[in-house]
Amino acid sequence: MAKRDYYETLGVAKNASEEDIKKAYRKLAMKHHPDRNQGDGAKKAEESFKEAKEAYEMLSDAQKRAAYDQYGHAGVDPNMGGRGAGGPEAYGGFAEAFGDIFGDIFGQNGQRRGPGGQQVYRGNDLSYAMEITLEEAARGKDTQIRIPSWDSCSTCDGTGAKPGTSAKTCPTCSGSGQVHLRQGFFSIQQTCPSCHGTGKIIPEPCTACNGAGRIKSNKTLEVKIPAGINEGMRIRSAGNGEPGTNGGPAGDLYIEIRIKAHDIFERDGDDLHCTIPIGIATATLGGAIEVPTLGGKAEIELPEGTQHGKTFRLRGKGIKGVRSSYPGDLYCHVAVETPIKLTEHQRKLLRELDESLKKGGERHSPNAKSWTDRVKDLFK
């Protein structure tokens, strides 16, 4: 059976923003979450929930969405780069989208029970700000980053208990990690306040890790930045967030892109803008000038009488965005510079030129003549 289109599954347009996609997923996740659907419709609701989660995971990731937009389902490998729609991690995306809004109803942060009846917690997501140049954003790059990580404590072998001792079953929750409270007609399930959901208490914590069972360290990750990425976009590295508890899945790492200010270009979507300074002689007489692009040099032919602020468009000399079929354009804005620090001889030549131009009147300076007439009308 063919998979449904991810955009159709979430009920959003193909150009939907990240926020629109997240809102649509939240709505569907709330509607179809298994804890809200019991009885005859439970199986269908679970399938719908998994479909929505899979669509959200693909479309909320810049790289995966770009691949899906270009190649469809064939462009995304379900065995790489993230959690699948099923398996023991199937409900992680719900916690990511909703946080702990429904903690008292569904359990804190979307946790599940492990094989021993203990609460299983998904690890927290981490964020990492990466600054790159405009050139790197346009062409993409492969790079490495170092992020905080956790290793199992070698002193206690990850148990959190002092060597020679062991963790005990929590007497408050009898090892379940949860307690049940009755409020009126409702029975509410909450995380055990004594063991914080682990189902165990440690009478004598390991001194090396303070009972955590893990030691903070660092690890190096390979990161592929797609060509055309823009300011504020995020790359998700699945499973590289904080580790889960009691065998729960790790959170994700979100790498947020920041682009350094460029000396020449300003980016606007897929388009680039730059200011080209020229002298009054070049502006007056015209001629060919060289302008920079991200791919090298290009040439613009200036007509005679080019005015300050005139814009020239070079098609295809912008940036090809991650979800664009064609590159944007480069807009060159002319800035006519007034000469400074003139010699007396140069001043004399300019005065002579000015006198000569005044004789031509409107023919040489049509805008000045029009402006003068408007000023006269203002003071009539």
Curated annotation (Swiss-Prot):
Ranges: CXXCXGXG motif repeats: 153-160, 170-177, 192-199, 206-213
SUPFAM superfamilies from the UniProt entry: Chaperone J-domain, DnaJ/Hsp40 cysteine-rich domain, HSP40/DnaJ peptide-binding domain
Region of interest called Disordered, as start-end residue ranges on this chain: 357-380
UniProt entry keywords in alphabetical sequence: Chaperone, Cytoplasm, DNA replication, Metal-binding, Repeat, Stress response, Zinc, Zinc-finger
Residues that coordinate or bind Zn(2+) 1: C153, C156, C206, C209
Record comment regarding domains: The J domain is necessary and sufficient to stimulate DnaK ATPase activity. Zinc center 1 plays an important role in the autonomous, DnaK-independent chaperone activity of DnaJ. Zinc center 2 is essential for interaction with DnaK and for DnaJ activity.
Protein name as it appears in the record: Chaperone protein DnaJ
Organism: Methylibium petroleiphilum (strain ATCC BAA-1232 / LMG 22953 / PM1)
Gene name, Swiss-Prot/TrEMBL: dnaJ
